[in-house]
Structures are given as C-alpha cells and as structure tokens.
Amino acid sequence: MDAAVDLLDPSKALNLKHIRQQLIRMEDTITFQLIERVQFPLNRTVYEPGAVKIPNSNLSFLDWTLREREKTDSLIRRYQSPDEHPFFPDALLKPILQPLIYPKILHRNNINLNDKIKKYFTDQVLPSICHDFGREDRGEQAENYGSTVTADIQCLQTLSRRIHFGKWVAESKYIDDPQGFAKLIKAGDRQAIGKAITKPAVELQVLERIRLKSRTYSTDPCESDDPEPKINVDAVVAMYRDCVIPLTKEVEIDYLMQRLSD
C-alpha cells in the first residue's frame, strides 16, 4: 500500500491536500501499470468463464487468479486496511500478522464498487488500449495468460483503491460543511449532493494531467522527435473521464447518503 497518506493519523488521512497528493501518485501507478499491460494481447480467453480449464472451478482465469491472490493478500493483512476493498470478500482468510489498530476515521459503510470497476475494465478499457498483434488468441500453450492476468490484477487493485478513496474525499467535504450536507442527506437529494461535490475545473485538470502523463511515460524520447506512445493516450483519458471520475463520485455520494446512519 502506498503510504503517502498515513491512515493511522486522522489529521493527515482527512486532509484534502494529502488526499490529493495520494490521488496524483496513484495516477502515476495506474499509468505505468496500463503500459505494462499492453505488452500483451487482449487474450479474451482469460475473461471467459470455463474457457481455461481449472480444477474444481468454473471461474474465468482472471477471476480465479484474482480470487486466489486475494486469499494470499488477506493473510498478510491487506484487507484490514480501510483503503483496500476485495473483489472476492468470501475468499478472505484470517491474517497471520497481528492486526494494526486503525483509528475510526470513516463512518461505517458497505460501499464496494469492484464489480462495476472490473466489468468496465474488462469490457471497455482493455479492448481500447490493447494492441492488435495481427493474430487470433493462440491458446494457453502459446500466449502469456499468466502474465496477462497478473498485469490486469495490478491495474484492478490500484483502480479500486483510487476510486474508493472517494470515501476519504467525501468525509473531508462533510466535515467542512456538516450542516449543508446533512440537509441534503436527510432530503435524499443525490443530485444536489452530486452537484455539491463536483468541481468541473478540477476534473479538467485531472484529465489534462492524465493525458500528459500517459504520453510522457509511454514514449522514448531517444527514438525520434515525435515518438509514438506505447499506449492509446486517448483511451487512458477516456477511462478516467468515463469510469474513474464518475465512479469516484458515486462512491462519494453513496458514502454521504450513509453518513448519518447509525
């Protein structure tokens, strides 16, 4: 877990400046992880349940690998951290490490958008960023299925953490104006809450920054005066515009709607 924001320190965990720094650092991580992913073909087979034969499982190869990875991660306390959200909560095991004692920072909530994140990533993001290698999927004995889903899982886990950081953003905004938000929450006015938390100028800055990072990180300046990016820059920007930003706001709104519950 990136430790730029100390979740054991409430004064930092809910400081919007520190949260913003964390989100910007995650932009770097996500961009590099996507660049790593596009080394491999789309390999659609790994997303089809039962297409790769797995003993005692009908899951897709991605889902099976992700589920097994989360089992291992849970043993080393990953999902005790409040900024981590499992894709397969039923797979988690008791950690072998003693628990960290986190202070109560967030209001109790049950928000987990990982199903939406995974569906958008596999259905929309991957087809738009993966290169056409000029061949069909050649099967598990010829394609790098293991490396493919390993790269996918790294992307998914960071995207999940980035999007669910909306809870910290929402709590920070609520603390700044508890009376104003309480009124909207009691009225059940999700649209007004969405308007209150939205800053179009900030969203535009994010998209411009993502475009610059995607192009910069995916080009070799030594190749030519105008090197070709290793990744579809427009597709990365679209992922933020159509998925990361909207789902982060959905997390914020859902969190605020639960903020006054017992």
Swiss-Prot record:
Enzyme Commission (EC) number: 5.4.99.5
The entry's keywords: Amino-acid biosynthesis, Aromatic amino acid biosynthesis, Cytoplasm, Host cytoplasm, Isomerase, Phenylalanine biosynthesis, Secreted, Tyrosine biosynthesis, Virulence
Cellular compartments annotated: Cytoplasm; Secreted; Host cytoplasm
A molecular function GO annotation: chorismate mutase activity
Known pathway: Metabolic intermediate biosynthesis; prephenate biosynthesis; prephenate from chorismate: step 1/1
Cross-referenced Pfam families: CM_2
Regulation of catalytic or functional activity: Contrary to classical chorismate mutases, is not subject to allosteric regulation by tryptophan or tyrosine. Also not regulated by phenylalanine.
Residues covered by the Chorismate mutase domain: 7-261
Any one GO biological process: chorismate metabolic process
Domain of life: Eukaryota
This protein's GO CC annotations: cytoplasm; extracellular region; host cell cytoplasm
EC primary class: isomerase
Stretches the record annotates as May contain the secretory signal: 1-100
Effect of mutating residue 162 to A: Abolishes catalytic activity
Catalytic activity: chorismate = prephenate
Record's subunit section: Homodimer.
Summary of the function given for this chain in its UniProt record: Catalyzes the Claisen rearrangement of chorismate to prephenate. May function both as an effector during plant infection and in the fungal tyrosine and phenylalanine biosynthesis pathways. During infection it channels chorismate into the phenylpropanoid pathway, thereby decreasing the synthesis of the plant immune signal salicylic acid. Within fungal cells, it acts at the first branch point in the aromatic amino acid pathway where it steers biosynthesis towards phenylalanine and tyrosine, and away from tryptophan.
Protein name per the record: Chorismate mutase
Organism: Erysiphe quercicola
